[in-house]
A protein has these predicted regions:
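Hydrophobic alpha-helical transmembrane segments
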Residues: 130-177, 348-352, 366-391
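Helix-loop junctions and terminal segments of transmembrane helices
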Residues: 21, 48-69, 235, 239-265, ...
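Membrane-water interface segments that mark the loop-to-transmembrane alpha-helix transition
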Residues: 5-18, 42-98, 264-289, 345, ...
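Interfacial segments at transmembrane-helix termini and the short loops linking adjacent helices
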Residues: 34-35, 93-107, 113, 292-321
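Hydrophobic faces of transmembrane alpha-helices in multi-pass small-molecule transporters and flippases
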Residues: 3-20, 100-104, 127-131, 187-223, ...
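Signature of the first transmembrane helix
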Residues: 2-56, 200-227, 354, 358, ...
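Membrane-interface junctions at transmembrane-helix termini in multi-pass inner-membrane proteins
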Residues: 60-67, 109-131, 318-347
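Interhelical loop/hinge segments that connect adjacent transmembrane helices in multipass membrane
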Residues: 1, 101, 127-132, 150-157, ...
Length: 403
């Protein structure tokens, strides 16, 4: 399957999922208010961080390990999904007043959703992955429609999402991968020690990367208000999320394709250049679209609260460009680079989040200033990372050609 076709299948499903996500935000804002949109965004961010903390990068092993280790890897990931999630939600309960039972089930089931996705990537089942991705936001929207009160929504969402993901796992899992030994403690212990370098470096990097992405919503809710977080959530959903989904679609395809190249000790530098050009082109078009089109959409189809989000959308433009043009290429460092280099990239981004949404609001509580600092620092940082990745890809190509 070609790069464009593989990425397009995942990207098309993501566009459809984005439509359901948009309807969820629209319905929630009109039915319950923008502050509840902020609380929903807070809950989702906490769940997404928890899913990555629970797996701790172990899902990246699913497409990379040999056939004999797939069963061990899946069992290891499932144990993490439920055991680590319990500890994570217990810690979160000290900082936020959230419905713990629903947050726990959501965190564990979103972890299993990632497991299912990466098993589909291993098998290159892009059509099935696309359908799964559409079904997840559809369940959220249906759960909201079925909720007479916003408090009921989280419990209905948690239960329905768990049933959905269990169905996908049952439908898509090849049970011939598993043996009785895969479920034994000693087998899991040996698996952990064999891959502990990956888990400690790549796992930490992935958790930090996800925290850098989700923490702004959490911290805006904390420092400013759920209403301001609602504005940020609207821009995230209608401007940033499509960008992240498109970038993730390319990243998922290249991760699957280049992981196979890694196993075969090759590197397709021509395809790397095609991906690079594709990302920069669509990033430029996306930024122009947000600048000119989003204000018109809010003016003609939104209300006063939606119009208030236009300023946020324009402050986010440098961040949007970096997320689409530069960030998906970090998969090269993830597969072919050293674990420490990928970890360093993510730690530097987390420091930018800390500087923009912790230090700045602590000394001067100004939402626009914090957001502008965050977007400019992120764009500058990822541009430097982008330049380094290009140099490393060129060296990698030359090294392989010499072999």
């Amino acid at each position: 399957m070609s790069l464009v076709k593989g990425a397009s299948i995942i990207g098309a499903s993501s566009v459809i999922s984005q439509v359901f996500g948009a309807f969820t935000i629209l319905f929630m804002s009109s039915q319950f208010g923008m502050a509840d949109v902020g609380n929903y965004a807070l809950t989702l961010s906490i769940v997404m961080i928890g899913a990555q903390v629970s797996l701790y990068g172990s899902h990246f092993l699913l497409p990379k390990v040999d056939h004999e280790e797939v069963g061990q890897a899946v069992v290891f990931c499932m144990l993490q999904s439920w055991c680590v999630s319990a500890v994570y939600v217990f810690v979160v309960s000290f900082f936020f007043s959230l419905p713990l039972a629903s947050v726990y089930v959501l965190t564990a089931s979103y972890s299993m959703m990632v497991i299912s996705e990466y098993m589909f990537l291993r098998h290159k089942a892009f059509n099935t992955l696309a359908i799964q991705r559409i079904s997840v936001p559809l369940v959220v929207f249906v759960s909201l429609l079925a909720s007479p009160k916003v408090d009921y929504f989280y419990y209905i969402w948690a239960c329905s999402h768990l049933v959905l993901i269990l169905t996908w796992l049952y439908k898509g899992m090849d049970f011939s991968y598993f043996s009785k030994q895969d479920f034994q403690f000693n087998t899991q212990k040996l698996f952990f020690f064999k891959h502990q370098n990956h888990l400690s470096r790549i796992g930490t990097a992935e958790v930090v990367a996800n925290a850098s992405l989700q923490l702004p919503t959490v911290l805006i809710n904390y420092w400013f208000s759920p209403l301001v977080a609602g504005y940020f959530a609207v821009v995230n959903r209608f401007c940033l999320s499509p960008v992240l989904i498109l970038g993730q679609s390319v990243r998922n395809y290249t991760f699957s394709k280049w992981s196979e190249d890694f196993r075969n000790k090759t590197f397709n530098y021509t395809e790397f250049k095609q991906v690079r050009l594709f990302l920069v082109s669509i990033a430029a078009m996306t930024v122009a679209g947000i600048y000119f089109v989003y204000p018109l959409i809010t003016e003609y189809f939104g209300n006063e609260q939606w119009i208030q989000s236009v300023e946020t959308s324009r402050l986010m433009l440098p961040y949007v460009f970096a997320m689409l043009a530069f960030v998906p290429l970090t998969v090269v460092e993830l597969i072919f680079g050293t674990p420490s280099s990928f970890l360093r990239i993510q730690c530097e981004q987390l420091f930018i989040v800390f500087l923009s949404f912790v230090l700045l609001p602590f000394f001067h509580k100004d939402y626009a200033l914090s957001l502008l600092a965050f977007t400019l620092l992120t764009a500058g940082r990822y541009f430097m990372v982008y330049m380094k990745i290009n140099k490393n890809a060129s060296k990698l190509n030359q090294g392989i050609l010499e072999k």
